[in-house]
Amino acid sequence: MSKNSRLGTMMFLQYALWGAWLPVTARYLSAGVAEGGLGFSGSEIGMILGLAGSIGAVAAPFIAGQIADRYFSTERILAALVIIGGVVKWITAYQTDYSAWLVLSIIYSIVYMPTLALSNSITFAHMKDPDSDFPKIRVWGTIGWIAASWAFPMIWLQTDLNFQWMPPFIVGPEVANVTNRLADALIFSGVISVTYGLFCFMLPNTPPKKDAVEKLAFKKAFELFNQTSFTILVVASLTVSIIHQIYFLQTGPFLSSIGLKDSQIGPAMTVGQFAEIAAMAYLGFFLKRFGFRKVIFLGVLAYAARYAVFGTVTLPIWIMVVSQAFHGICYAFFFAGAYIYVDKIADEDVRHSAQTVFGMIILGGGPVIGGWLSGYLQETFTQAGLFDYSLFWYTLSAVGFVTALFFGFMFREQVEKRTAA
């Protein structure tokens, strides 16, 4: 097995274990006990999926950068973390108490979030031509997410599969206890995690770095706030990361409320990952042709457009499913474009720290604020036990639209002002 093939398999498993559980968990947590779910409130779900993610994002740089990079071979610490994470996910699947879910989700986030950086670190350490090789290897992560999101319902939630023209294309009658079985997505993720952990021992050896990380790197990275473009980007990114988090908190329950079967939620949401593959493939072209400001602006505007479609709840289900394609534009044009811009304006000796600072702000702050806001808006727009999804999504669309205008008018590229390291 070639080195690039092993790295591609690593990415496949890295994101497959995530795609196995994230799209359907909110639906399982929000469904009533009589339906087979846990009946948690919007605020509780926001804490489970929001606060946990934020804590993990803040802890990740310490675990990945200060411990893994210095004292252990990267592939071995990666193996340990994903195996521990798999066990935690398996245990979580059997819990019905909110407190247990919250604690276990925080533990899982602390061990899983660092693996995102570690898998990237291994990949970059063994590529001859990163600009050419990384997109080809990273795309297997998206494919892994799609594969897991499709495999679980086809194997465990449906019978007598048949082909249909609308995503998720391959469907069949649902099993009787389909909502209750959504919890098994966590077990499925746990199995993938343990498999991934064992596979890590087949990865190329990536020894710890002998040189200490420059202590002033973080201080220098924070000096990027002296550049107006970086400050504007961070403000817009924090806002976008908030409404981005709410997508994963509410889309599953929303699709169920308009008539999509529980077994079809995960596959339907992968329309966004298919679009992501295409958007990432052409991201370089768009950046060269239109520049960072216009591309990132379109990424933010895609959030407003997607939530506007969701808010028009009278539209057919197939339009709601197809509109998931906006997710690919949202992620590639905004998040990938933003990370590339940060890399461009940071001095070479602080690039890693700059990305870490940027990531901590949007991945640390966004999920916890998004989790709280999702619960608050759900309670605000619920009258007589009925949740008005239309007002909910239109509110988020307005936030996205205002953010797009703010970014479009205020942001000016400053790549040329970067000084040499």
Predicted regions and their residues:
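C-terminal ends and interior cores of transmembrane alpha-helices
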Residues: 79, 83-97, 301-315, 408
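Hydrophobic core of transmembrane alpha-helices in multi-pass small-molecule transporters
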Residues: 12, 88-118, 122, 238, ...
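A membrane-interface helix-boundary motif in multi-pass transporters
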Residues: 154-191, 376-400
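Helix-loop boundary and gating motifs at the non-cytosolic
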Residues: 1-55, 229-270, 335
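Central cavity-lining transmembrane alpha-helices of secondary-active solute carriers
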Residues: 46-66, 270-282
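Cytoplasmic membrane-interface "Motif A"-like loop-to-helix N-cap segments
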Residues: 68-82, 288-300
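Juxtamembrane intracellular "pre-TM" segments in multi-pass secondary transporters
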Residues: 1, 174, 200-237, 257
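Multi-pass alpha-helical transporter architecture, strongest
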Residues: 6, 92-93, 192-204, 392-421
